[in-house]
UniProtKB/Swiss-Prot annotation:
Keywords on record: ATP-binding, Magnesium, Metal-binding, Nucleotide-binding, Nucleotidyltransferase, RNA repair, RNA-binding, Transferase, tRNA processing
Segments passing through the bilayer: none
Note: A single active site specifically recognizes both ATP and CTP and is responsible for their addition.
InterPro entries in the cross-refs: Bact_CCA-adding_enz_type3_sf, CCA-adding_enz_C, CCA-adding_enz_firmicutes, NT_sf, PolA_pol_head_dom, PolyA_RNA-bd
Any GO BP annotation: RNA repair
Cofactor(s) it depends on: Mg(2+)
Pfam families: PolyA_pol, PolyA_pol_RNAbd, tRNA_NucTran2_2
Protein's gene: cca
Catalytic activity field: a tRNA precursor + 2 CTP + ATP = a tRNA with a 3' CCA end + 3 diphosphate; a tRNA with a 3' CCA end + 2 CTP + ATP = a tRNA with a 3' CCACCA end + 3 diphosphate
Residue numbers binding ATP: 27, 30, 111, 154, 157, 160, 163
Function: Catalyzes the addition and repair of the essential 3'-terminal CCA sequence in tRNAs without using a nucleic acid template. Adds these three nucleotides in the order of C, C, and A to the tRNA nucleotide-73, using CTP and ATP as substrates and producing inorganic pyrophosphate. tRNA 3'-terminal CCA addition is required both for tRNA processing and repair. Also involved in tRNA surveillance by mediating tandem CCA addition to generate a CCACCA at the 3' terminus of unstable tRNAs. While stable tRNAs receive only 3'-terminal CCA, unstable tRNAs are marked with CCACCA and rapidly degraded.
Name recorded for this polypeptide: CCA-adding enzyme
Sites where the protein binds CTP: 27, 30, 111, 154, 157, 160, 163
Taxonomic source organism: Listeria innocua serovar 6a (strain ATCC BAA-680 / CLIP 11262)
Residues binding Mg(2+): 40, 42
Length: 393
């Protein structure tokens, strides 16, 4: 049995010893059955939140209104959630009310897909009332109960369906795909932040092209930031070798290259990305547009390492040769990597000339920077001074 489950087992045992039901649930059980890596576990129990808090010495109210208590056991933290049913979903995301219950099957009924509605008890016996194991065997993404109801409860589940297709290389069952097609407009009620998380996970998957093909088939792109009317661009994006991706930022640079938005910053801000990512993508896109077959010394210097490595990564994803090692070596061999590396400063210029500060200081340093970069003069104080026409000290 997986070590992650074994380490968390005492939590289940304490709950059952106290007379309650307790199970591992959700993605950890699914990934165990798929022989995929498991990073953490979720635990569901018939114990109500206050009862959970009485059983364990160290607890935190992380989501107690929805039945979740964080339990600290063996120096690890585990989210323990009470079995529950949910009322109507007024905003296509959150239930209007949550009712705590004692039934595992009723709790599993509210979950999104059958492969995520399998529970495992302390003896590692599986409880699978909705045939999630069969769906896994058939490589099928099938909604629990009526797909239309599950998508109406939380519209993000439609994006999750496409993401799971990419991650697992599964397919949607007929009813789930039909509901996805018919209810796709509900996605407009979902926050961009949640959509962005699913998009990134989708592109990190193993079946990106199939996922984007489905996304376009159901016209999901209409409800994603900056994608309306961009089917051909997304088809091009999907055709690239995304298995060669090593950074998340490459995903966004790839989108900018494919979609060619008139305002890159606005396009990326619509996805709620950090300013640091937006700035890096802007610089990398400009560098990619201006780059020739090989990087010139000046291009490497002005691009800086993060930029040229990102450009190299997207070029590799798009089918060009990987030049990362070559570029890193060339960058390391540059005589300087920024103006701060120059052997002289503005203070030196003022001292040597006796002049007042002014624009001429920056202009002179720019000239020196260029000459050092091109190897015309060494980055050595007296040599620079001689080149400028001043007497040596």
């Amino acid at each position: 049995m997986n070590d992650v489950f074994l380490k968390a087992l005492p939590v289940l045992q304490k709950l059952t010893t106290a007379g309650f039901e307790a199970y591992f649930v959700g993605g950890s059980v699914r990934d165990y059955l798929l022989n995929r890596p498991i990073s953490d576990v979720d635990i569901a129990t018939s114990a109500f939140p206050e009862e959970v808090k009485e059983i364990f010495q160290s607890t935190y109210d992380t989501g107690i209104a929805h039945g979740t208590v964080t339990v600290r056991e063996n120096k690890e933290c585990y989210e323990v959630t009470t079995f529950r049913t949910e009322g109507t979903y007024e905003d296509f995301r959150r239930p209007s009310e949550v009712t705590f219950i004692r039934s595992l099957e009723e709790d599993l009924l509210r979950r999104d897909f059958t492969m995520n509605a399998i529970a495992m008890d302390e003896n590692f016996k599986l409880h699978d009332p909705f045939s999630g194991q069969l769906a896994i065997q058939n490589k099928e993404i099938k909604a629990v109960g009526k797909a239309s109801e599950r998508f109406h409860e939380d519209a993000l589940r439609m994006m999750r369906a496409v993401r799971f297709l990419s991650q697992l290389d599964f397919q949607l069952d007929k009813e789930t795909e039909t509901a996805l097609t018919n209810q796709i407009a509900l996605l407009q009620h979902t926050s961009v932040e949640r959509i962005t998380v699913e998009w990134i996970k989708m592109i990190k998957g193993q079946a990106v092209k199939r996922a984007i093909d489905l996304l376009l088939k159901v016209e999901m792109e209409t409800y994603l930031p900056g994608f309306k009317g961009e089917k051909s661009a997304l088809m091009e994006f999907a055709s690239w070798n995304w298995e060669k991706r090593t950074t998340e930022t490459a995903i966004w640079l790839g989108l900018v290259i494919a979609v060619k938005p008139s305002n890159i910053t606005a396009f990326l801000k619509a996805w709620k990305l950090p300013n640091k990512t937006i700035q890096l993508v802007n610089k990398a896109y400009e560098a990619a547009l201006n780059m020739k077959e090989t990087w010139l010394t000046e291009e490497l210097y002005h691009a800086q390492e993060a930029v040229f490595l990102l450009v190299n990564e997207i070029n590799n994803i798009r089918g060009q040769s990987d030049k990362e090692d070559e570029l890193k070596k060339a960058y390391e061999l540059l005589p300087i990597h920024s103006k701060k590396d120059l052997a002289i400063t503005g203070a030196d210029l003022l001292k040597w000339t006796g002049e007042n500060a002014g624009p001429w200081v920056k202009e002179t340093l720019d000239k020196v920077e260029c000459q050092v970069l091109l190897g015309k003069i060494n980055n050595e104080k007296n040599q620079i001074k001689r080149w400028l026409g001043y007497h040596e000290e």
